[in-house]
Structures are given as structure tokens and as C-alpha cells.
Amino acid sequence: MDFKNYSLMLIMRKTMRLKLFLFAGMLMLGMAGLNAQQIIAHRGYWKTDGSAQNSIASLRKADSIRVFGSEVDVWLSSDGVPVVNHDAHVTLNGKELIVQDTPLATLRKVKLANGETLPTLEEYLDAFAQCDHVKLIIELKMHKAKEREDLLAKQVIDRVHQRSLQERVEYISFGIHIVQQLRKLDPQAPVYYLNGDLSPQILATMGLNGFDYHYDVLYKRPEWVKKAHELGQKVNVWTVNRPEDIQKVIDLKVDYITTDEPLLVRQTIDKQ
């Protein structure tokens, strides 16, 4: 072999090693991205100008920052219409009203902090259909009677399916009866339990996709994260806002972080 060919062979070997090194680095970065926690904006991205909790603006703003999901709370009005609000009560002209005991016409007079009218689920889903990036995480609130919870679950599932949005929507609830109804009405839907009192093994017998617990629950029972993953379940935690808690739940290897501070959570994840 002459010197010219030998030099060429050395260059080719070095080039190949460099390519392999770069490929391995890209693969590791890709795996890190796959393993990184996903962010869910709690009641939408509302800590920003022009937004408010559970407003349509908060949904659109969550979509604009490209988080995994935007969470929203749904009640049934007294006349059977799903409406969007977190608390069990709203205030109208200085008077406190119970959402589930109030007709839609009255609830529509309520204004959110950003001036929006309290939205119906129909309006929220129509706005969501125009979003490009987020999933919608719908929390169905517990009601006084199981019959009302049944009606709420059916109304929500029907409205999602009517718009062919089922691949983009997930469901959560504190109510055992509600999550069971959701599973019955839509066997393929991702359904998660919120209350923090049931083990992954019990949730598996219910056919649920995992749990969405307050972070304090997992601080006391960190083994539930590993057990859930062994059972093929996903783990979400709420509502994680402080830097120290964000880091703790990342270290616990949860799958999703629900937060009022989506940009802070993203910055923390990116630093890992």
C-alpha cells in the first residue's frame, strides 16, 4: 500500500469514527427527549396577559407554547348543559351561585377575569378543534347525584366524538363512579384517577390508564411510580409549581407534570 492510499484509509477511518460518535450523541439526546416529562397547563396557560383560568384564551395560549396538554374543568348546569369552571360556585352580582344548581342562561352572565363569558363545553371544544399542538385533559367534576355524573360523562363523551376529537382528548376525575362511567362509555379513551387513595394494582383492575395524584402522595409512596410503569400505566402529578417540587417529581420519573408554571417546568426539564 503506498503512502497516498494509506493516508486516505486513515482519513476514512477517522471520518467513520466521527460519524458514529455524532450518531451516538444524537441517539442519546433523542432518548433523553423521549424520557423527558410532558407538561400539562393547569386550567390552561392563564398566568399571562389576556388570559384567565379555564378561559378559551388560556387554551389557545397553552397551544401557542406547545405544551403536551391543557387541562379544563367541566360541570353540568341545572338544565343539563356541560359548562367550564373549576370551582363549585361562581359569583354573579355579588351573589354566590352553585354551578350544578344554576341554569345555563344565568351562568352565561358570569364573566371570567379576562372578560370572557363563562364558556360551555361546546364552545371550548370548538376552540380546541382549531388548536394545532395540545391535547385536552378534561376533568369531570363530582356531582351530588350519580345520575347527574352519568349524564355529564355521556354529554362529554358524545360531544368529543361528534367532533372526532377522541384521539386528542384524555379524561380525569376524583370520582370513582365517573372514571368507571368514562371507561364504560369509551373503552379506548385514556382515563386517569385523581383522588390519590388507590394503588396502581387496583387501578389496573378497573381498566384505567394510570393515575394523576397530588405530588405529596408520591412523596409518601414513591414506589407507586415504578409499579405503575411495570403495569404499563402513566403517571401524572398536580399541581407542581415550586422549583424544588418540580425537580423532585422529575427525579421520581413521572410521565406528566400538571402545573400553573409551564414555562418554568420546561426550563427545569431542559436543564436535566
Question: Language-model segments: which ranges?
Answer:
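Phosphate-group recognition and catalysis centered on beta-loop-alpha active-site segments
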Residues: 30-272
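Bacterial Sec-dependent N-terminal signal peptides
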Residues: 1-38
